[in-house]
Design a protein with these regions (language model features):
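Active-site core segments that coordinate phosphate-bearing ligands/cofactors
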Residues: 8, 17, 109-122, 131-146, ...
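Nucleotide/phosphate-binding loop and acidic/charged catalytic motifs
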Residues: 72, 166-172
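Active-site phosphate-binding/coordination module
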Residues: 64-130
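Glycine-rich phosphate-binding loop of ATP-grasp-fold ATP-dependent ligases
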Residues: 91, 170-177
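Short beta-strand to alpha-helix junction loop
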Residues: 181, 204-208
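A short acidic/small-residue loop/turn micro-motif
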Residues: 33-37, 97-99, 199
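N-terminal glycine/serine-rich phosphate-binding loop of ATP-dependent small-molecule kinases
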Residues: 1-93, 145, 216-229, 391, ...
């Protein structure tokens, strides 16, 4: 059992969330803030550190009026780093969607280690953390070339307790800075001096220290409120999936669905990976779990593409509320051969160079949403095949409520046990398992069933029309 009330701070790209959990693992409260665009004092687009910081203090103050917290666990995405010195933030993290100048990017690409060493593909904009550090040194060399480099969850841990730490799930997610098989910094990180500026390596579950006096005053926290080191958000979802009986002790893949669809294949036992066997050009990568094990992964921007395909005139369709209509429309779209072909978000995913197009774009929004569900399933199936996903598959996140997507994926992968997590709190549940590994899940997994109509001919046609020379396994 957890000891006292716990807060999980999940700082994503789009939203910052603070959830409060009771000692028996029940959700007590949830607070959400949309993140704003920001510009740093040095003139580059950055993440909204100041806005999140102010919101966090105000929210913690409201939370602690109802009862004190015993611990805070920070979670964050894997494409942000801050440079700090003592108790000062020297440089805020770049916005990873900002495009590097062409010359700056070319100079960085020439220095990267191979994918076969790092498991990090060359990603666009600032999605490789090394590219951000390289660009920061060009923008503000005096500030960027000294100080401690902190990844995003560990920045918030430092902000709350004043202790710097590095952690492997954040260092090992497409950063270019880490070797997932060897478990050490990359040669480029060493050569550029970045490895020597990383904070001491700590485990995600380590308590770094109690909150500072500043946060005792601003957030109303007690002096014994402990701050954990924290972890990468997708790894928290993986840790959550491992808390279910259906996945324990067996191969398991978690498909987290939101703006990004991230598939992470966790083997039952550690095996030696040949990183060169994964196609770098198709957005495959190798993450690292909380135990230091390499985790083959693949991604595409499914949530973003679904929005582009649906093109909602007003409110987007709620797939859970419209299940029967969407399934019927999906059947009709399959019979007519109406398809969305990849990729509508160029530069990422299994078809990064292909130009997205409709074979016959429906005028009706509901029909477009049905085809979007089929498209997401075909894209997910492709990514899952690329990383060798087998046995149990857990779909979590908002698209676990999309019946066309989930049932189409079950049709495409009949040899896998496909489960849905409708908890909508997989990330905080995974974070809580750092404190109590035996904490039972607060919602059972649901087994999904295939579509009630045949998808094989439609699938074959979609695959034959995709604009790639790669083989779909």
């Amino acid at each position: 059992m957890l000891q006292g009330r716990i807060a999980v701070l999940d700082v994503g790209k789009t939203l910052a969330k603070l959830t409060i959990w009771s000692a028996d693992g029940r959700l007590e409260d949830r607070h959400v803030r949309p993140n704003a665009r920001a510009v740093s004092d040095d003139g580059y687009p950055c993440l909204d550190v100041a806005g999140i910081d102010a919101w966090l203090a105000e929210t913690l103050r409201a939370v602690t009026e109802k009862g004190q917290l015993s611990a805070i666990v920070p979670v964050g995405h894997g494409a942000a780093a801050c440079i700090v010195d003592g108790d000062t933030l020297r440089l805020a993290p770049l916005d990873y969607e900002a495009e590097l100048p062409a010359e700056t990017r070319a100079a960085y690409l020439a220095q990267r280690d191979s994918f076969a060493r790092t498991g990090s593909p060359a990603l666009p904009a600032g999605l490789n953390l090394g590219a951000q550090l390289h660009w920061l040194e060009a923008i503000a060399p005096q500030k960027a070339r000294s100080g401690v480099i902190l990844t995003w969850p560990q920045f918030w841990a430092w902000r709350l307790c004043g202790v710097v730490a590095a952690e492997i799930t954040s260092l090992g997610c497409h950063t270019d800075l880490w070797l997932p098989v060897e478990g050490c910094p990359s040669p480029m990180a060493v050569a550029r001096g970045w490895a020597g500026r990383l904070a001491p390596l700590r485990r995600a579950a380590d308590g770094l220290g109690p909150v500072t006096e500043e946060w005792q005053k601003r957030g109303g926290l007690r002096e014994n409120c402990m701050v954990l080191c924290g972890l990468h958000d997708s790894n928290a979802a993986l840790l959550a999936a491992r808390g279910h009986a259906e996945t324990r002790g067996r191969d398991c893949t978690v498909l987290s669905t939101g703006t990004w669809f991230v598939a992470m294949h966790s083997a039952a036992a550690r095996t030696k990976l040949d990183l060169s066997s994964f196609p770098e050009a198709r957005d495959c990568l190798v993450n690292v779990d909380v135990h230091g094990n390499p985790v083959p992964s693949a991604r595409f921007m499914g949530g973003r593409e679904a929005e582009m395909l649906e093109q909602a005139a007003a409110a987007p369709i709620d797939p859970k509320a419209c299940e029967a209509a969407l399934l019927d429309l999906a059947r009709r779209m399959v019979e007519r051969g109406v398809m969305a072909l990849p990729a509508f978000q160029k530069g990422v995913g299994p078809f990064p160079e292909s130009e997205g197009r409709w074979t016959d774009r429906p005028a009706d929004q509901m029909a477009r949403r049905a085809v979007a569900g089929l498209y997401l399933a075909l894209m997910a199936d492709t990514s899952l095949a690329l990383i060798g996903s087998t046995d149990s598959l857990v779909i979590e996140g908002r698209f676990a409520d999309d019946p066309v997507f989930t049932r189409a994926l079950a049709s495409l992968r009949p040899r896998q046990n496909i489960y849905l997590s409708h908890a909508h709190d997989s990330v905080p549940y995974g974070a809580l398992r750092l404190i109590d590994p035996d904490l039972p899940p607060h919602a059972a997994l649901l087994r999904t069933s295939p579509l009630p109509f045949d998808l094989s001919f439609y699938t074959a046609q979609w695959r034959s029309r995709t604009l790639t020379t790669d083989t779909i396994v």
